[in-house]
Amino acid sequence: MKSIVISSNSSGGGKTTIAVGIMKALMKKGFDVQGYKVGPDYIDPAFHSQITGKPSRNLDIYLTGEEGVKASYSRGKGNLGVVEGVMGLYDGKGIDSKYSTAHVAKTLGLPVVLVLSPKAQSATLCAEINGLINFDKVEIGGIILNNISESYYNLLKAAIEYNCNAKVLGYIPKDERLKIGSRHLGLIQSSEIEDLEEKIDICSEHILKNIDLEELFKIFKKTPEYEDNFHLENKNLKIAVAYDKAFSFYYRDNIELLEELGEITYFSPLMDKELPKDIDFLYIGGGYPEVFIEELSKNESMLKSIKEELDKGLKCYAECGGLMYLTEAIENEDLKGNAVGYFEGFSKMTKRLQNFGYAQLEVYKENEILPKGLKINCHEFHKSTVELDEDKIFKINKTMYNGDTKHWNCGYIKGNTIAAYAHVNFLGNIEFLKALLEK
C-alpha cells in the first residue's frame, strides 16, 4: 500500500475536511482507499469508514507503542492509504513531539501533506511553513491551502514557492456547505449528519477541480511489510459487544483481537430486548448514552437482562459511556433516565471536560481479575462524573505538560465486572485483555 499523512499546524486547520475529501476523490478515480487516524479519536474514523466502506484504523503510539502502530497499519486493506493527523503536526502528549503525527509519520516512513487555513498572511505564512519543514526530520511532500479565495490562493502559492522549499498542490475555496456541526466530543457522529454524503461529495469535487492530483499521487509512498506479532489463540469464547447509536466507540484493533478469541455477537441496548444467549464476555464501549437516555431507559427488558447476567457473574468490561450505562441513572440537564443499575450510584453530565488526555492506569487493589501492579496506557475524554458506592480498582497517573504528575483513584470492580472512564487499546495492553477473560 502507498500512503500519505494529512496534517496541519493546529486543530481546526481543515484536516478532517481535506482528508475525507481526498478519500472520496481517490475512490471516484477508482482506487481502493484505507483510512487511518492518528491518536485516540473515535469520531473522525467513523467519517473515514462511511466513505471507504471499511473500518478506519487508529494509529496511536502512546496506546499501542511503535510496533503496535506498525501492526495496525499493516492490517489496512487497499491500494492507497490516507492517514489523518491529530492537532498540529508536532503536537503530542507533552511539550515535545513524542506521540505526535510527526512521530507516527516517521515511524511508518510516510510523507506529510500540510493543510493550512491562512488569514491575512503571506510572508509570515512562509516563515511558519519553513518552521514546520525544518523543526524535525519529517518529509513534507506538499501543501494544500484551505478555505481561501482563488485570488488569495494565487498570491500565497507564488509566495510559498518563492520562499519555501515546498510544493503547493492546490486549494479548497470557501464554501459554507462544507461546515459540520459539533458535539461535546468534537465532531458529531457521521451517522447523524443527514447530508454527510453531499458534504463529502462537494469537498471531493473541489479537490478534483482545484488540487493537482498528479503531483499528489507522486507523494504517496510505499511502506515496507511490517511485522504483526499481536495475535491471540482462539478460546472459542462467545463475546457480546454493545453497538448502536448510543454505543459506537470501539478501536478496530480491539474488535479484531476479540474476534481471534472467539465469536462476536453485536447487540443493541436501544433496540434489542435482551442480551445474546450463552455468552462468556460482555463489552460495552463508549458513546453517547446520555443523548439516548430516554430510549435506553424505556428498554426495561434489556436493562433487566444485563443486570441479571452481571449479578450471576458474567464477565464484563465497560468504558466511559459503558460505565455510565451500568449505573442506576444518567442525568443530562433536565433529562434523567434509569440505567442498568448494576453499580450503586448515578452519572451526571457536566458542562466542562472532567479529564482529558493520555494517562496510565495502575491496578492498586487486590482482586480476582487483574493482577495488582498491572499498568495500562489509556486515554480519557468525558464531560460527566459518576458518584458510586463501589470499590475502586485503579490508581491513575497523568503527566501534565509542565512535567508534574497528578494521581487519583478511578475505575470500579464488582463481581466479574470492571468499568472505568478510561479508553484502552487492547493492542498495546494485551495482558490486560487476557486478564479480563482468563478468570
From Swiss-Prot:
Catalysis performed (reactions): cob(II)yrinate + 2 L-glutamine + 2 ATP + 2 H2O = cob(II)yrinate a,c diamide + 2 L-glutamate + 2 ADP + 2 phosphate + 2 H(+)
UniProt-annotated site: Increases nucleophilicity of active site Cys, residues: 423
Disulfide bonds: none
Catalytic residues (UniProt): 320
GO biological process: cobalamin biosynthetic process
Cofactors, names only: Mg(2+)
Keywords: ATP-binding, Cobalamin biosynthesis, Glutamine amidotransferase, Ligase, Magnesium, Nucleotide-binding
Enzyme kind, highest EC tier: ligase
Pfam families xref list: CbiA, GATase_3
The GATase cobBQ-type domain, residue ranges: 238-431
MF annotations from Gene Ontology: ATP binding; cobyrinic acid a,c-diamide synthase activity
UniProt EC number: 6.3.5.11
Pathway(s): Cofactor biosynthesis; adenosylcobalamin biosynthesis; cob(II)yrinate a,c-diamide from sirohydrochlorin (anaerobic route): step 10/10
Family affiliation: Belongs to the CobB/CbiA family.
Miscellaneous comment text of the record: The a and c carboxylates of cobyrinate are activated for nucleophilic attack via formation of a phosphorylated intermediate by ATP. CbiA catalyzes first the amidation of the c-carboxylate, and then that of the a-carboxylate.
Recorded domain comment: Comprises of two domains. The C-terminal domain contains the binding site for glutamine and catalyzes the hydrolysis of this substrate to glutamate and ammonia. The N-terminal domain is anticipated to bind ATP and cobyrinate and catalyzes the ultimate synthesis of the diamide product. The ammonia produced via the glutaminase domain is probably translocated to the adjacent domain via a molecular tunnel, where it reacts with an activated intermediate.
Function: Catalyzes the ATP-dependent amidation of the two carboxylate groups at positions a and c of cobyrinate, using either L-glutamine or ammonia as the nitrogen source.
Protein name listed in UniProt: Cobyrinate a,c-diamide synthase
Gene giving rise to this polypeptide: cbiA
